């Protein structure tokens, strides 16, 4: 029996209304805008972002929270599954504020992931969290501080309402590679005008800065250097630049100890040309295997040793630390 005309019209009207609601530019625009925002903010796939928005009726805040919770759960599961995979790549991060600094190493499996913004963000968060940990313990900064912390210790560090361990799991869930927080060096000298901490990062990642108070820099190599200003009469004293140059030497020449100051050289005018040449050859031979920093030829000026450079600048080298991403530590 055919349907009454009115019913047919009603069905057609409902279908038209459904089509109107489905294609309405305002509603469709809101969905697309939120989908784009959520995708850009979280980095998750469009499929997962749409699923989250549908689940919470386009509520961005709730959708983002749910996505992160799911990624973190998946990340912890992946972390357990991938924990035996080798992590030889990664980045070194250096954060500094005044006479306090921290240097961290976070590893991943491939250089491709090491260049990913999400991984860089994690390394920055680890570096800033460790610096915050130093600042949270004022008693540590009253004297000399040099403490190496393991990845297992660092995972427990709180950052906001989460931990570094949870952040790492979240990043593993997003990027799909084994990621390990390997180590962190806490470093500080007494906050007095004559003592300084210098920082240097080699092969820095574009868009990161280092060497300024409150900054964080990322790269493949890093160095922290502690030194004391002995002669306050020197003009144009630039502690940050001196620290950067000393750190560059540490990264490039890989000294093992500070060592002892070399003896003051004789005046060049008192030597014959032949004697000068012989001494230069002997100096070159010995410098190749020299591990005491003060006795090494200064990387940025081969005409002098590091010791002579510090004497010239009126400073005393106290200590240094060098990190190389992926290096094998001697047992």
Swiss-Prot record:
A biological-process GO annotation: mitochondrial translational elongation
Q: Which InterPro entries match?
A: EF-Ts_dimer_sf, Transl_elong_EFTs/EF1B, Transl_elong_EFTs/EF1B_dimer, Transl_elong_Ts_CS, UBA-like_sf
Query: Which Gene Ontology cellular component terms are annotated?
Result: mitochondrion
Which key words tag this protein in UniProt? Elongation factor, Mitochondrion, Protein biosynthesis
Write the signal peptide boundaries.
none
PROSITE patterns, per the entry: EF_TS_2 (PS01127)
Q: Which domain of life is it from?
A: Eukaryota
Stretches with biased composition (Basic and acidic residues): 262-275
Q: Where is the composition biased (Acidic residues)?
A: 276-291
List GO molecular-function terms, semicolon-separated: translation elongation factor activity
Q: Which Pfam families match?
A: EF-Ts_N (PF25025), EF_TS (PF00889)
Q: Disordered: where is this region?
A: 254-295
Q: Which family does it belong to?
A: Belongs to the EF-Ts family.
Q: Other notes on this protein? A: This protein may be expected to contain an N-terminal transit peptide but none has been predicted.
Q: What does this protein's UniProt record list under function?
A: Associates with the EF-Tu.GDP complex and induces the exchange of GDP to GTP. It remains bound to the aminoacyl-tRNA.EF-Tu.GTP complex up to the GTP hydrolysis stage on the ribosome.
What is the protein named? Answer: Elongation factor Ts, mitochondrial
